[in-house]
UniProtKB/Swiss-Prot annotation:
Name of the protein described by the UniProt record: Putative RING-H2 finger protein ATL36
Subcellular location field: Membrane
Entry remark concerning the domains of this protein: The RING-type zinc finger domain mediates binding to an E2 ubiquitin-conjugating enzyme.
TM region(s), chain numbering: 50-70
Residues modified to Phosphoserine: 264
Catalytic activity: S-ubiquitinyl-[E2 ubiquitin-conjugating enzyme]-L-cysteine + [acceptor protein]-L-lysine = [E2 ubiquitin-conjugating enzyme]-L-cysteine + N(6)-ubiquitinyl-[acceptor protein]-L-lysine
GO CC terms, sorted: membrane
Provenance organism: Arabidopsis thaliana
Positions annotated as zinc finger (RING-type): 123-165
One example of a Gene Ontology biological process annotation: protein ubiquitination
Amino acid sequence: MNIFTRYHLPRVVSGVILPLFLFHLLPYVTCQQESVPTNSIRQTNLSADSIIAIVVLAIFISLGMVSCCLHCIFYREEIGAAGQDVLHSRARRGLEKEVIESFPTFLYSEVKGLKIGKGGVECAICLSEFEDQETLRWMPPCSHTFHANCIDVWLSSWSTCPVCRANLSLKPGESYPYLNMDVETGGVQKLPNERSLTGNSVTTRSRSTGLLSSWRMAEIFVPRSHSTGHSLVQQLGENLDRFTLQLPEEVQRQLVSLNLIRRSHIVLPQAVSSRQGYRSGSVGSERGGFSQGRQTHRRALSMSFSFSFQTASVRSIHDMNDQAQAKDKYFGERSFERLMPEEKV
């Protein structure tokens, strides 16, 4: 039973069909009364009764039609208001700008040689491969990576990951655990592998690698159906793996810390750039000073990101060289002392 049948059928029966049925019976009533012996008084009374009945029926019919029209008008207004609420709710389904900017961005050339495996080479939105100088945005909850422009447009209308549908929205008062960082020291306090979102608990690799593992297990039981010898399950797994950028834990921490430092020091480069422009003699070229400061800040961040992962290896090599030199020096001095004759007193 639809909405019209539920709400309008009783009104139509009581306001339209019943008066029409009574109006249809009037000729039979008048015919039966005309068969009665007539006189002038009774004819006058019968004509008055019929007129009254017709007027009453007309009033009932008009009232029924007016009530149906009013109900339709009010019902249409309610539907319009509900539709506006649905449209507004759909428009508010996206993430806020601050939440979108909290996801780390970087150049593909900076992490191209640090990624684990062969994944993370294609954007799932525009289906184009990453270039070295393109800016990417990385989703820490699911390790999926997209072009910054593509994912920003998507997250402005939707609050889920385009690949694994992980819910990225937060409840009021919540915060992302991987954003717990001491901005003054520049170090991440904690980067857990799991974080709880609204409704579901999504791990860093639960959606992507979990589906891949299930598909690879199902590959054993699914027969080869393609002429090239590749199964459908294997193709699905490989296609999904192309969108997943797996990075070492230290690299993930560096990405998050650099992103937070960039967001927290967004005003500082302007002051530095204005001073640099004034000291360099470019008085009046305030725009050039600001752009120079932003370029200097970006260069410093990229240099810190590029060389931060090589510090440990360089230090270890220097330490090993120093220890080897000290050891050789020690043994060389000892062996040389043994060859020297003892002086007699």
